Amino acid sequence: MAKKAPARTVKPRAAKRPARPAFSDWETPRITGLLVLADGTVIEGFGFGAEGEAVGEVCFNTAMTGYQEVLTDPSYAGQIVTFTFPHIGNVGTNEDDIETTNLAATSGVRGCVVKAAVTDPANYRSHRHFSQWLRTRGIIGLSGIDTRALTNLIREKGMPNGVIAHHARGNFDLKKLKALAAQWPGLVGMDLAKDVSLTQRMEWDETSWDWKSGYGRRNGIATHKVVAVDYGLKRNILRCLTDAGCEVTVVPANAEADDILALNPDGIFLSNGPGDPEATGVYAVPEIRKLVSSGKPVFGICLGHQMLALALGAKTRKMHQGHHGANHPVKDFTTGKVEITSMNHGFTVDRETLPQGVVETHVSLFDGSNCGIALEGKPVFSVQYHPEASPGPQDSHYLFKRFVEQMDKAKG
């Protein structure tokens, strides 16, 4: 019988120890972003988007969607936007949904503050990562922030001036940043419309976005000709006017009434925009008075609403915390209905100063502030909120129809 070979003794191989992490892996992540408020408060976080420093008024926006539209809305010029919804940037960005009409200028927004770190985009329409997109537009981002606490601070103390800063190495000159925040004069008395407005006339014919075909072009002959004055005009307002059958010509903020009327419009639109209405009104309000006197239908939104009120004899004032979001309830006194609206303003028409003959048509159900006016006996009206819904609900699209009906009536 053959002998069995002796069993081999196999020494078990020692398990390979995982490499010990370098000390730096255990360190607290480096702070690369700061928000420094005018009262000296320093809020630490992580920078993304553009690097550098920018000063502005810190506000909060409660919309859950539409961050790209918000950050390209010229009405946010001079502001640092805090998003209360925690997940921002997760559907990426594209070049189609930009709201700035004047592509030669930036929207003017100074920065954005978010809670969660920005993730890779997951959306079939996305062209670029949110952080990369911010970098190309020169907008500073700050993540890792307790946005609920910051929002409560704004609600209690008002919208503070502040500096948002992003440096990859975390090298900050706190003394300098605090001085910048404390010395910035704020938005009162600031005319920002001139910085975001077109500088020359433009024709517009793009229509609203469709699931099948995207943004389109007006088909057929327009039924009405509208001149839109650009104080910081959003594209979706122009699309809504085009959808309503209007041929739209856009003119700069400093356009004179005589030049506007020489275009022989059926109606005149006064757009949204940033800054203090009294400051922009220095040159705009006298022209608006002439437009109202012409008898042409006039429709205003946001800054256009405020300056129309000034032209009719009312006054405006700075708000404590402003209205920024897509969930603001407004009551329409003409119908008795309540609509959910999109808002973005830090100034408001003082309802106590509305003169005789100017009727309050809409009011905020949050704080009772004025949200709409109409001039008795004339086709002139305006609203404080954004009926074009970008972002936001579409409850107020009827206002564009109302404008068209007034033009129909004026034409006979």
Outline where the language-model segments fall.
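RNA-binding accessory domains that recognize and position tRNA/RNA substrates
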Residues: 2-263, 275, 390-395, 401-412
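Residue-level structural signal for beta-strand termini and adjacent loop
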Residues: 47-48, 86, 344, 375, ...
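Proline-centered loop/turn at the N-terminus of a beta-strand
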Residues: 140, 225, 297-299, 315, ...
